């Protein structure tokens, strides 16, 4: 069994870790960074760029550069939060045939799990390069407040990337694992405040020593899957755009290129203001009108930034109140507060969290890496490399079915420890009813239509009977990933019908399988593309070196040699205009041969000319005289 890696698939950045001996280790990517931007770009030549390379070209390719796609995963196009996002991103968000939110790139419709899979592939490759072995299994983290369809979509992304997802684990729980595993014995209750790039979670977790086993029990969890650093960036972008409109009368919202530059500048300004009290946003040639080019220059102070985003920070405290209430605790019962997610570096966030919990958050947890480290520890628990650790997570939202009158009847309450199974008996609403529709729901509202619909199925062939007589047992079963199966059984006939909830939307098994095959085909294409680039680089280098040799040779090269070399160069340059790898290799070899004799002749002459010079040098060294020296200290200040 290979190693199980831990991946924090973030909205803004992703991170991969593995248990290396006794210690979990964050793995640096090919660029030498410990985190990778969760950005995927589709270049003009068809190449797929992931991470820093995608981020670097975002300004020149805004409509084909996809960021923060995690906010769309498992969501419907008509969701309010998706509609709000459409006007704020330069790329195109569209409705899929089943109503899901997808993206469109160069006329191609793509599902969010497909885009996330590109990021996961990069993390997989990063781990493989470090370990020197193939990686096929992973633990992937999700926001604790992700619903069933969002979890399922994340699992699909893993499958498309060629990973068997051994477990989906909640981000705050993973951070608690990273923090608590090496802490001294004794019981403690911690609050994990996780404000990342796109999502917010709060989890109250009890860490206890039970018979020598370290037990992490989630008491409650709450959050907002559309609140994060991206929203803070948006506030800055809106402010900069409004200031620019005030001074120039031009609305930058209609210009994707300007929007992308604003996004980069806004994010940079936000980060800078965590350590300084003022910064300047200077974007020359942001746009142009009939009077000529326009420049954006805005001073932004920390207090102005805080006034723009304070509402968002306060919005995060409501779930904290609810989580404490659900755990039946008060802020004073919390022993430690852990901050996770890059946005928690903001001084205002730290101040409000300190004020709310009445204690300073811990500073010894890396907010960018803790989640991936925790995921790798969970991977090691699953593979048996780490023992004496028990993780008890919860389902974040209540689960139930729609009953008469459009009411949601809850079977599993929110914050129930998982895995779990609950059953309840229902009956028919009309006389001689021969079928019932089971409509599974997730949420906290009493009105069924106000909750998230997870799926429907029918139980048919119920024997005719007066209403209320048939006994239909409905069972909800949640696995350790928080993914749900529902079954319904007619007690009289024993007939049973069940489904694994794939959500009323989501990707079908066939679609996922096709995407897996596409990804594998793309991997082969990528390999061929890489080989072609290497061959091209070798050819370019050969042309450059040969031309230099010709110049250096001057008259020493015969007319025949020059002609043969020039012909070989022309033929190789012609081959380079095609994508024919074999042809380029063949013409490179031909040039190597054509220039070989001249290169040898030049080398032999250079060698012959160097020998007398060496003799002279030796003689001059023999004549050297040792001299005394005196240190001069005049310049010493």
Swiss-Prot record:
Pfam family, one: HSP70
Alphabetical keyword list: ATP-binding, Chaperone, Nucleotide-binding, Phosphoprotein, Stress response
UniProt induction comment: By stress conditions e.g. heat shock.
Gene3D superfamilies assigned to the protein according to its UniProt record, in alphabetical order: 1.20.1270.10, 3.30.420.40, Actin, Chain A, domain 4 (3.90.640.10), Substrate Binding Domain Of DNAk, Chain A, domain 1 (2.60.34.10)
Ranges annotated as biased composition (Low complexity): 605-615
Phosphothreonine: modified positions: 199
Span list, region Disordered: 603-637
Extent of Acidic residues compositional bias: 623-637
MF terms (GO), sorted A to Z: ATP binding; ATP-dependent protein folding chaperone; unfolded protein binding
PROSITE patterns the UniProt entry points to: HSP70_1 (PS00297), HSP70_2 (PS00329), HSP70_3 (PS01036)
Keyword Phosphoprotein: yes
Role description: Acts as a chaperone.
Family of the protein in this entry: Belongs to the heat shock protein 70 family.
HAMAP family assigned to the protein according to its UniProt record, in alphabetical order: DnaK
Name of this chain's protein: Chaperone protein DnaK
